[in-house]
Amino acid sequence: MKAYTVEQGIVAPLDRANVDTDLIIPKQFLKSIKRTGFGDNLFDELRYLDEGYPGQDNSVRPKNPDFVLNQPRYQGATVLIARTNFGCGSSREHAPWALNEYGFRTVIAPSFADIFFNNCFKNGMLPVILPEDIVDQLFKECAAQEGYQLTIDLAAQEVRTPTGEAFKFEVDPFRKHCLLNGLDDIGLTLQNADAIRAYEEKTKQVRPWVFQEIN
């Protein structure tokens, strides 16, 4: 998993509350668990004017010109700002997979659905909770300035605007450690690889039948 330290990037504003996971990545695209291949269908119902289905050539589909991710000024965005209860609905982990593959490493909102919030950390993304009035301010600044960027400093737990204004955010120390060091569940386990091997060798001496192959 790629480490998250300091991220600076263009901001895309998604100005709607209660964005659920089916809107983030519709159910018809959940036929793979490879974690890849979902970015082109992120917000499919909002990005395209036709109905999406797996295997389509998205490059020839008619796009919704009014949707934020189709507007030239937001191309290359890596920071998404959203409204309350972002990521509600089903627990599909494909939602952060789609956001991540599109290019978003940070989502800023006043609140998140719990399962989506947890899944972001497991997939190298940082969900940042800021007070609603500050999120309102970010929306206004983003609308007023083309190419608006934010800097997110995980070590300092700060979101910084182009003018240098800084907003503090909270993050669980363990999750912070994992993101800073690029550790997912597998990476955390491998940190104890020597201890695991030592345990297995010891167990082979005490209970050798456990390790016998069954033909």
From Swiss-Prot:
GO terms for molecular function: 3-isopropylmalate dehydratase activity. It catalyses: (2R,3S)-3-isopropylmalate = (2S)-2-isopropylmalate. It comes from the Bacteria. One of its GO terms (biological process) is L-leucine biosynthetic process. Keywords: Amino-acid biosynthesis, Branched-chain amino acid biosynthesis, Leucine biosynthesis, Lyase. It is an enzyme of class 4 (lyase). Pathway: Amino-acid biosynthesis; L-leucine biosynthesis; L-leucine from 3-methyl-2-oxobutanoate: step 2/4. SUPFAM superfamilies: LeuD/IlvD-like. Catalyzes the isomerization between 2-isopropylmalate and 3-isopropylmalate, via the formation of 2-isopropylmaleate. Heterodimer of LeuC and LeuD. This is 3-isopropylmalate dehydratase small subunit. The gene is leuD.
